[in-house]
A protein has these predicted regions:
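S-adenosyl-L-methionine-dependent methyltransferase catalytic core, i.e., the SAM/SAH-binding region
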Residues: 1-321
Length: 321
């Protein structure tokens, strides 16, 4: 990518910005960690809230995002201390140890693929552009990519991934078609994969519910990046590092992510689990978090119209006791 357009490509409208800022309740001097830095759309505003006596930590595994975000923060909030950490938020413990922070007052997780990643065809996230099948959040790592999943996993495992991670009704048919096609030639591009998906879905079903490849692309992306395992580890670490009164704000975009967030907050907010017939608690469980959002926040209609990515966004918030 041309260096001159790097920052421009990583500028996008942050989802539910007002709700995020209101939910985190940051103040001057707070330490805040944006676990999904991206183009720093949320981070710039959070940095402005914590001010020169506060501190912003930004986590991302994408070198392009880190470079663009760093330039934007230097330009728009030059007086606010900020530290950018390259890595996966599943490794939040190690990253925060390296940053030498005693605790954090606010965590933001904006899950899913950023708009700029979708817009760069060579990354292989988009079903609207023909590109190599990659889908790695950190393309610099020599790790599993989408082409390897599609060309080497057996039919049973492919069907399971498409069904569980993509909630794809026609998972078995698509998996069968993948295996049939790869016996003829390797499946190497997003264009090939889209055609295979279409062939595995009945024509009548393809006419409804958005792009027919959306669910399958989501499923393969989650498998490549181990997104659900990473989310669970990230939430566990954030809960441990959160200062009393601090908050975790999570924006999710599909039911699998939202369920993990909901269950984590529920588990961490439970107190005694002893049976009612036991008069004195013996389990020792104490609540760690207080759930702030009994029901998730959703984007207002005007934002959805302006920013379609916000359509499926849900925010859940919890506070450290």
């Amino acid at each position: 990518m041309e260096r001159g357009i790097l920052t421009q490509e990583y500028r996008h409208e942050p989802v539910m910005l007002g709700e995020v800022l209101e939910s985190l309740q940051l103040k001057s001097g707070s330490v805040v960690c944006d676990c999904t830095l991206g183009g720093a759309g949320h981070s710039v505003k959070m940095a402005a809230q914590v001010g020169e006596t506060g501190r912003l930590l930004g986590v991302d595994q994408d070198d392009m995002a880190l470079e663009a975000a760093g330039a934007r923060l230097d330009r728009e909030v030059p007086g606010v201390p900020h530290q950018l950490l390259k890595g996966n938020f599943g490794d939040l413990d190690e990253l925060l140890c390296s940053a030498e922070v005693p605790g954090v007052d606010g965590f933001l997780f904006d899950l899913g693929v950023s708009s700029p990643q979708l817009d760069i065809p060579g990354r292989g996230f988009s079903y609207n552009e023909d590109a190599p099948l990659d889908m790695r959040m950190d393309p610099g790592n020599n790790t599993l990519n989408a082409a390897e999943v599609i060309n080497t996993y057996n039919e049973h495992d492919l069907a399971r991934i498409l069904r569980v991670y993509g909630e794809e009704k026609f998972a078995s048919q698509i998996a069968r078609e993948i295996v049939r096609r790869r016996e003829q030639e390797p499946i190497e591009t997003t264009g090939q994969f889209v055609e295979i998906i279409k062939a595995g879905i009945p024509a009548a079903a393809r006419r409804h519910g958005g792009h027919p490849a959306k669910k399958s692309f989501q499923a393969i992306r989650i498998e490549v990046n181990h997104e659900l395992d990473v989310l669970e580890r990230g939430l566990d670490a954030a809960t441990r590092w959160l200062n009393p009164g601090g908050r975790i704000c999570v924006i999710s975009y599909h039911s699998l992510e939202d369920r993990i967030v909901k269950n984590h907050f529920k588990e961490m907010s439970q107190g005694c689990t002893c049976p009612p017939e036991i008069p004195v608690c013996v389990c020792g469980n104490v609540p760690i978090l207080k759930v702030i959002t009994r029901k998730p926040l959703v984007a207002q209609p005007d934002e959805v119209e302006r920013n379609p990515r916000a359509r499926s966004a849900k925010i859940r918030v919890a506070q450290r006791l």
